[in-house]
Amino acid sequence: MKFPEDFTTAPGFDPAEDHIGPFYFQKVDDSDENAVIRQNLFAFEVASRHCNEFDSVHGGVLMTFADFALCRAAAEHYQVETCVTVSFACDFLAGASLGSLITCEPRVNKRTGSLAFVSGDLMVNDGIVFSFNSVVKRLPFK
């Protein structure tokens, strides 16, 4: 599948995500270099390397994709700060098969001085396949 032009990846930022993905996020108009990206739509297409023995996406891949999305949302796409996951709880609700397009729109429920609380669902079409709640530690760039 070729993703629309308004989606991109961030190769080189996280080697583990590069290896497992590619994971995509939707870009916004970046003609204003001072604008902070606030668009939080993420997606990936299930390839054979993402699947278990049942040709369904492996749960670890779903967890990694959710972590990719929630950290980018919590850290405003790493334009202002970075973060690390300190807590992650999830529920597997349905399978997703080879070729499925999985999307996520994480919700940043609260930010404190050092933490962000993020939740979300991974979707295939209109169905939820996975839900999560997470806490991340917000960190300044070095």
Language-model regions: role of each:
Residues 1-142:
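Terminal targeting signals and extreme-terminal segments of soluble enzymes
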